[in-house]
Structure formats: C-alpha cells, structure tokens
Amino acid sequence: MNLRSVGALALILGIGTAGAALAQDDAEERDMEAEHCVRVDDVDDIDIVDAETLIFRMRGGEVYRNDLPHECPGMRSSDTLMYRSSVGKLCSVDIVTVLEDWGFGFAPGVSCGLGMFHPITGQIADEMIRAAE
C-alpha cells in the first residue's frame, strides 16, 4: 500500500468515524429531550400503537411517545393497561401490565417495561396510530 492509499484510507475511516459520532450526538440530543418519568396524576390516556410503542396523552396537552425497550408480545391497540406507582410517577424503569378481558372480568396478562418518554405533538401521535391500524 503506497502513501496515497494510506491517506485515502485514513480519510475514509475518518469520515465514517465522524458520521458515527454525529449519529450518536443526534441520539443523545433526542434522549436529552426525553423524560425519565411523568406524573401519574397528569396521565389522561394511554394509546397502544403496537407491541413496542405507547402514546401517553397528558392533562394540559402534552403528548409523549414511549418506545418499550423490548417488544410486549400479545399487546394490541384494543387492550387495557394497568400500572402501579408508589411515588406518584410513572418512570422508564416501571412496568405496565396488559389486562385480559375474559368477558366476566379482567385478569392480568403480559407485563412489559417502559422506556423513556419522548415529547411529540398530538398530530404525530394521531398519525402513528392511524398508520398502525
């Protein structure tokens, strides 16, 4: 490999490294905007988009997208969710449980961990729900 080839290779590797660093910066910036917790008293409604995504609609108009860290198998948009909080907050370390409708009552189903709460607009939330239908 001659000196020119080494220089070109270093430039290519440098560009790739810079691109990866920029992508990491973008991800960190999005996470900086995200909230670890929301107040339980402020939760007005929870929409299930799919087995990996929830939409939290808050009193006061805020809307958050919660990307679950792992797929929640069997969770459907028509399901009802249950959660418990001893501190008045619902956080990214907490768990939601799908309530199974047995016709004569509900029984706990699968439980799944929450992710970070990413602020989004109501319009984006509505578009996500429509796209998932």
Question: Can you annotate each of these PLM segments?
Answer:
Residues 1-5:
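Positively charged n-region of N-terminal signal peptides that target proteins for export
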Residues 17-23:
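Sec/Tat signal peptide C-region and signal peptidase I cleavage site
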Residues 23-78:
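N-terminal secretory signal peptides
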Residues 70-133:
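Helix-rich interaction surfaces within compact, conserved domain-sized segments
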Residues 7, 29-30, 35-38, 104, ...:
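Short, functionally important structural connectors and interaction interfaces within domains
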Residues 7-17:
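Bacterial N-terminal signal peptides
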